[in-house]
Regions:
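N-terminal helical cap/lid subdomain that shapes the substrate entry/recognition surface
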Residues: 1-58
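Phosphate-binding loop of NTP-binding sites
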Residues: 75
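Glycine-centered short loops/turns at secondary-structure junctions
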Residues: 70-72, 146
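Short, contiguous strand/loop micro-motifs
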Residues: 10-11, 49-51, 70, 102, ...
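Asp-based, Mg2+/Mn2+-dependent phosphohydrolase catalytic module
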Residues: 34-38, 65, 79-175
């Protein structure tokens, strides 16, 4: 994580690709994988440009379609510049009015700058806002600012004890 934190301020998809090429090259050396430069670049290219690598939660489109009728939706994501293309490829980008991406700040959740940026962009007060995530650590960051946190425990790794409201499916947001 230290490597990513030191090298996460990335503005373009090409910078992202180069960053992952360096990252995979370093990992190859560290783990003695003996990957060739060509193999490293193939892996980095696939990670950056292959939109088939990404999936959404089951029922995400249905839930987003319903929620956008009554609520302004935003996204705060620990991610890279290719996220915009990824969200469009999976058909969910247009549900979000605002977006805050960690790569634009060189910081990861739960850094408060990400939550504050999203609040500023949407013109909402923290008390009027809900933040859904699968990480308790990220929820704590939102809660410290007065944002209502909800844990989505859609997979076993995120189904942990939580002081926050917990859902197991996005469909639960519609109830």
């Amino acid at each position: 994580m230290e490597y990513l934190e030191k090298n996460h301020l990335v503005k373009t998809t090409e910078e992202e690709y180069q960053q992952f090429a360096r990252f995979y090259s370093d990992i190859s050396r560290y783990l003695n994988l003996s990957l060739t430069n060509e193999e490293v670049h193939i892996i980095a290219y696939d990670r950056t440009y292959n939109m088939n690598n990404y999936i959404v939660y089951p029922d995400a489109k249905e839930v987003l379609e319903s929620l956008t009728k009554s609520y302004m939706m935003g996204i705060i994501s620990d991610t890279w510049p290719s996220i915009e293309k990824q969200l469009r490829a999976i058909g969910v980008r247009d549900y979000f009015s605002i977006s805050t991406y960690s790569c634009s700040f060189g910081k990861f959740k739960p850094d408060e700058i990400l939550y504050k940026d999203a609040l500023s962009k949407c013109g909402c007060r923290a008390e009027e806002t809900v933040f859904i995530d699968d990480s308790i650590r990220n929820l704590e960051g939102a809660a410290k600012l007065g944002i209502t946190p909800i844990l989505i425990a859609a997979n076993p790794a995120s189904d942990v004890d939580s002081p926050y409201l917990k859902i197991h499916s996005l469909l639960e947001l519609l109830r």
